[in-house]
């Protein structure tokens, strides 16, 4: 924001959930767009579809001149996954009877979100304005299902707290970020380093600790 960016937060859920309406302004966001601003949105079961929030993000990017930081939080593929199957459902196998329906719903939601994300990225790719996309998950799905006990990946407790991310720029051969294992708390500094907006405090943290990639904390 101090570098002249318009700052917008978007979340397709209730405005006061986790007091986002209070906390986002305190974090420096000029505007917060919540589910109340979506008119007759397309839904995936009881959640507003990711397609809708991607469209809202593009609307903000196209509407506001100058540089923009848009922090978009989706909710389509959040638990619970016990609802009835959708028309675009994906078949799954190898799970217990208890988990099959939930995994089917979860996989179907990912499939639909993946198509929406592709369309969003294609729109960004065609923009004249240089645009950086940072995509990450804030946590794994709920852990009440049996498959977490049987899948080898989750036998390592640390893997229950890891999520994927990517950083992508719509102007090829301009920025070439190095993707590495890192901590979510360091991802913001990573992005600022890529676009050349690190300040003295950021540089101190980077020089002192680098990009932490282990489960650890630092005392102040």
Identify the meaning behind each predicted range.
Residues 1-220:
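Solvent-exposed soluble domains appended to multi-pass membrane proteins
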């Amino acid at each position: 924001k101090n570098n002249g960016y318009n700052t917008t937060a978007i979340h397709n859920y209730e405005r006061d959930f986790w007091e986002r309406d209070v906390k986002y302004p305190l974090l420096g966001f000029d505007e917060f767009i919540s589910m109340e601003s979506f008119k007759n949105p397309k839904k995936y079961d009881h959640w507003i579809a990711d397609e809708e929030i991607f469209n809202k993000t593009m609307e903000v990017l196209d509407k506001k001149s100058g540089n923009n930081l848009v922090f978009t939080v989706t909710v389509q593929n959040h638990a619970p996954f016990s609802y009835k199957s959708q028309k675009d459902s994906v078949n799954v196998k190898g799970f217990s009877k208890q988990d099959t329906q939930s995994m089917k719903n979860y996989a179907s939601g990912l499939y639909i979100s993946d198509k929406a994300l592709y369309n969003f990225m294609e729109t960004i790719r065609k923009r004249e304005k240089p645009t950086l996309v940072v995509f990450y998950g804030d946590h794994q799905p709920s852990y009440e299902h049996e498959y977490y006990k049987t899948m080898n990946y989750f036998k390592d407790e640390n893997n229950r707290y890891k999520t994927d991310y990517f950083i992508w720029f719509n102007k090829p051969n301009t920025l070439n970020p190095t993707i590495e294992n890192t901590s979510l708390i360091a991802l913001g500094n990573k992005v600022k380093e890529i676009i050349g907006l690190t300040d003295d405090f950021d540089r101190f943290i980077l020089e002192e600790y680098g990009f932490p990639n282990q489960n650890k904390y630092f005392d102040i």
